[in-house]
């Protein structure tokens, strides 16, 4: 009996013809597009500024006057940053998933992953500190519609509280992910 060669075996692409490709133009026109570059650089800058503005200050904001408005504004800024970073990473991930064999695409994906991880490290403190605010204080702050709007998200974040580790350990896990 003759052995079959892997050269003669049909592949999924040869069996089904040309496979469909994602149109990622709704995210970015291309990996070198000015829109992608601007979003990434802007998010990196805004992430560092967010950390400067809020790290170590959430407990005081929650206890201060206008706590709901102040925390609501912070969550709104966090949300905008998270959306931008997610959009960039979604684009990079989908490009890579569409062609894992292309070294240029793999490099682009790796570069984006590295930059997004570095930028999001500036945001990691936010959920950790939010979970340090006691329930009664946070509940009172959520009476303000500015923060109350984010109640479902805050409740999800609070579910992670029992599993939260020391900040430095969380940072280490984040860097390694």
Give residue spans per PLM region.
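A well-structured
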Residues: 1-177
């Amino acid at each position: 009996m003759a052995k079959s060669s892997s050269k003669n075996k049909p592949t999924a692409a040869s069996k089904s013809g040309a496979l469909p490709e994602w149109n990622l133009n709704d995210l970015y026109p291309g990996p070198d597009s000015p829109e992608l570059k601007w979003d990434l650089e802007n998010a990196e800058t805004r992430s560092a500024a967010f950390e400067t503005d809020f790290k170590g200050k959430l407990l005081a904001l929650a206890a201060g006057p206008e706590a709901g408005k102040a925390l609501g504004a912070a969550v709104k800024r966090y949300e905008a940053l998270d959306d931008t970073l997610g959009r960039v990473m979604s684009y990079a991930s989908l490009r890579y998933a569409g062609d894992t064999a292309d070294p240029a695409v793999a490099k682009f994906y790796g570069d984006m992953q590295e930059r997004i991880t570095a930028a999001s490290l500036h945001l990691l403190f936010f959920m950790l500190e939010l979970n340090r605010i006691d329930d009664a204080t946070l509940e009172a702050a959520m009476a303000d519609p500015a923060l109350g709007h984010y109640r479902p998200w805050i409740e999800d974040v609070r579910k992670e509280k029992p599993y939260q580790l020391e900040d430095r350990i969380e940072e280490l896990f984040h860097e390694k992910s």
